[in-house]
Design a protein with these regions (language model features):
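Conserved acidic residues
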Residues: 1, 48, 131-134
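Active-site-proximal region of nucleotide-activated glycan assembly enzymes
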Residues: 1-23
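Short His-Asn-centered micro-motif
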Residues: 3-6, 53-55, 89-93, 114-116, ...
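A short helix->loop->beta-strand "cap" motif at the edges of active sites that frequently abuts
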Residues: 17-18, 82-83, 152-154
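Short beta-strand->alpha-helix junction loop in the catalytic core
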Residues: 23-33
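Conserved catalytic-core segment of nucleotide-activated headgroup transferases in glycan assembly
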Residues: 31-100
Length: 213
């Protein structure tokens, strides 16, 4: 039995000839690692916060990007929208690659990671990091995109690592929409994220228990 986000992904996995079930965004089932008092205290300390997810560069299928251009873009967005803090959530293997983590730190950003994706607390950490933010952005579309939208955080693709022509046609509508920042785009982003991450496929605790046991 395979679990995935959405019905559109269920169709894509049909060739595996195994039962495939859509359960919505996995982040729904994660727990924030801070209680409300701790969360409020940290949010007060951070102020208005921009959260950036740089594309992975160390894993299979990773994409390289020009970090100095990325830092300039983030500083411009920080100034434009009046953020007090910029948090960069890096893939755990990328933090020390080419000194990227140090460069982000020198720019005045806070660098963090949710850790290895197979760590039992990976999603709990990721959910906590996202909930601390007021606005999120990335230079690519990834799992984080749908998670941010699901958790009610605006998301924008800036300085993208691929052109629309380079993007897989299956995901081109996501890239094209998330590069826009209009009021209508926010509505379209929610609709697309729901389609690909299965916001309407969430299971109850009892339903999940029945699937897992």
């Amino acid at each position: 039995r395979i679990m995935t986000f959405s019905n559109i992904r269920v169709k894509g996995l049909g060739s595996l000839h195994k039962p495939v079930i859509a359960i919505g965004p996995y982040i729904h089932y994660a727990e924030c690692m801070l209680n409300s008092e701790e969360m409020n205290s940290l949010k007060k300390e951070l102020g208005k916060t921009l959260l950036f997810f740089p594309t992975h560069t160390c894993c299979e299928g990773g994409l390289e990007y020009e970090i100095h251009c990325m830092i300039d873009e983030l500083l411009e967005l920080k100034e434009k929208l009046g953020f007090d803090t910029v948090i960069v959530n890096m893939y755990y293997l990328d933090e020390n690659k080419n000194g990227f983590g140090d460069l982000y730190n020198k720019a005045g950003f806070k660098v963090t990671t949710a850790g290895h994706q197979l760590d039992i607390n990976f999603l709990n950490r990721l959910k906590t990091i996202i909930l601390l933010s007021d606005y999120t952005c990335s230079n690519s579309i990834g799992t984080h995109t749908g998670y941010c939208v699901y958790l009610g955080k605006p998301h924008l693709v800036i300085n993208p690592v691929q052109t629309l022509e380079e993007v897989n046609p299956l995901w081109r509508d996501l890239w094209e929409t998330f590069e826009k920042d209009s009021s209508q785009a926010q509505v379209d982003k929610r609709l697309l994220a729901s389609k690909y991450w299965g916001f309407d496929c969430i299971k109850s605790r009892e339903e999940m228990r029945a699937l897992l046991i």
